[in-house]
Each structure stands twice: as structure tokens, then as C-alpha cells.
């Protein structure tokens, strides 16, 4: 009996360890080789056909912004590849007639991998697929960093008043990039508080939101981040109460 119990415990621990390894392995960045060379080569051809006239054959930018270098990376880093892919798929090429023949989603995906290659991110063994876009984060060559100034972010903290009419989030979490349309999720309700503080601007941009009704509540704030020493702030696009108690 004891041998059976020990064997069962060993199998359980092995399963848990494997599951944890799979979970950690699913969190990737573009530094991990998330596309293949063959995929990027296809993307080169599609890019030349659909994008080169505006963005330049070397992604240097002509009538449209460059798709390589620090300016491009700063705009998108610390976010998943999904929003970048959707931006390209839904809006590019700019000015394309509505009745034009649709560009296959796979071509857009290959173009994205070519952009990654030109920006210096190494290829791997497997192709990038659409179901992986939400699990791969675009980062600079120095790895994960705090989100940049101007990014649309989400943070969780306690709503407090300061001065006569100012409002802020105290004990706030480190901001993370988020699409503007995302709403609160059960996981955000359970988010542990942090140590940061952000002033809140443009409260009037949030429909039907009265800050005095949510004082000392645990809130999720979304908006555009301004990095400024001792005066970091978020220009709000959304506010949502997560818990009436901020503990």
C-alpha cells in the first residue's frame, strides 16, 4: 500500500512539474525565435508587393513611418504581437480600395515575421501562427522593460482624493499595455495591489463615472501613460470598480 501511495505521489509531482514547465514555456518574447526563416522569406515578397511603396523596400519609411528602429519598437514594445498584427491586417495598405481583392491573413502574418527579421530578431525552427500572437511579447533587444511613455495601459490600485479636486490611484500595480477595448476580467479582480501612485487625468472622458462614489475602492484604470518624475499620470479612457474594499 505504501509503495502504491509513494508511486502515486511521484506521478502527481511529475505531472505538476511538467505542467509548470509548459506554462513557463508558453510565455515567450520575440527574442525566443518565434518564426522561421522560410516564413520571413515569404513575408519579404508579400511586403514588397503590398507595403514597400509607402514604407520603403528596407522598411526605412517613405510616405509612411518606418517599420524598423527604435521609434517603431517604442510604439509597440511590451505588448503582445496580436494588436500589431491586427493593426496591419485591418488598416494596411493605407488607402486600399474597399472593393480590392482581400489579402489573405497568412500573407499579413508572413509580413509581420519579415518585419521582425529586419529588426534583428532571430528566427527559430517553427513558423509563427495566429494562435500564438497573444502569447508572444514584442520587446527590445534588452528584454522586458517598463512600458514606455504614451502607451495605453492598465493598472489596478486604490482610488484616493488629493487636494481639493484631484484624484489618484495609490498602491497601484506596474502598468501593462492593453488594447483600448478590453474590459475587466476575473483575473484582474484578484490582482494584488502594488506600490506605485498615479495621478488621474481626463476623468470626464469616462462616461457616468463619479470618483467620489468610488473613493477607497479597488479600481482598474485604463488610459494613456505619461512618464514624468514625481508626477506620473494616466489620462483615462476607462475606470471600473473591482472591489469596494481596497485591501
List where the protein language model places each region.
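The canonical Cys-X-X-Cys-His
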Residues: 43-57, 111, 115
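Extracytoplasmic electron-transfer domains, predominantly the class I c-type cytochrome c fold
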Residues: 62, 68-123
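Short linear capping/connector segments at secondary-structure termini
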Residues: 28, 64-72, 128-134
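Conserved RNA-binding domains used in RNP assembly and mRNA/RNA metabolism
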Residues: 108, 112, 128-247
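Bacterial N-terminal signal peptides
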Residues: 6-17
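Electrostatic cytochrome c docking/interface patches
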Residues: 21-46, 140-149
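Gly/Gly-Pro-rich "capping" loops immediately C-terminal to redox-active cysteine motifs
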Residues: 33-40, 58-89, 170-192
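Positively charged n-region of N-terminal signal peptides that target proteins for export
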Residues: 1-4
Amino acid at each position: 500500500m505504501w509503495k502504491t501511495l509513494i508511486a502515486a505521489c511521484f506521478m502527481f509531482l511529475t505531472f505538476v512539474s511538467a505542467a509548470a514547465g509548459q506554462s513557463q514555456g508558453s510565455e515567450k518574447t520575440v527574442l525566443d525565435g518565434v518564426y522561421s526563416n522560410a516564413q520571413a522569406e515569404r513575408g519579404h515578397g508579400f511586403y514588397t508587393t503590398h507595403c514597400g511603396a509607402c514604407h520603403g523596400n528596407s522598411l526605412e519609411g517613405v510616405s509612411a513611418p518606418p517599420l524598423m528602429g527604435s521609434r517603431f519598437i517604442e510604439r509597440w514594445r511590451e505588448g503582445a504581437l496580436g494588436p500589431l498584427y491586427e493593426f496591419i491586417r485591418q488598416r494596411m495598405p493605407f488607402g486600399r480600395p474597399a472593393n480590392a481583392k482581400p489579402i489573405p491573413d497568412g500573407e499579413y502574418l508572413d509580413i509581420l515575421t519579415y518585419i521582425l527579421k529586419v529588426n534583428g530578431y532571430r528566427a527559430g525552427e517553427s513558423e509563427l501562427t495566429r494562435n500564438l500572437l497573444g502569447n508572444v511579447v514584442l520587446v527590445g533587444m534588452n528584454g522586458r522593460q517598463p512600458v514606455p511613455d504614451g502607451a495605453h495601459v492598465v493598472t489596478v490600485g486604490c482610488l484616493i482624493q488629493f487636494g481639493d479636486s484631484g484624484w489618484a490611484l495609490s498602491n497601484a500595480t506596474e502598468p501593462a499595455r492593453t488594447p483600448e477595448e478590453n474590459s475587466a476580467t476575473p483575473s484582474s479582480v484578484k490582482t494584488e495591489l502594488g506600490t506605485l501612485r498615479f495621478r488621474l487625468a481626463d476623468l470626464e472622458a469616462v462616461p457616468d463615472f463619479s470618483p467620489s462614489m468610488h473613493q477607497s475602492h479597488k479600481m482598474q484604470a485604463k488610459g494613456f501613460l505619461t512618464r514624468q518624475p514625481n508626477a506620473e499620470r494616466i489620462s483615462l479612457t476607462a475606470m471600473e470598480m473591482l472591489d469596494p474594499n481596497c485591501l
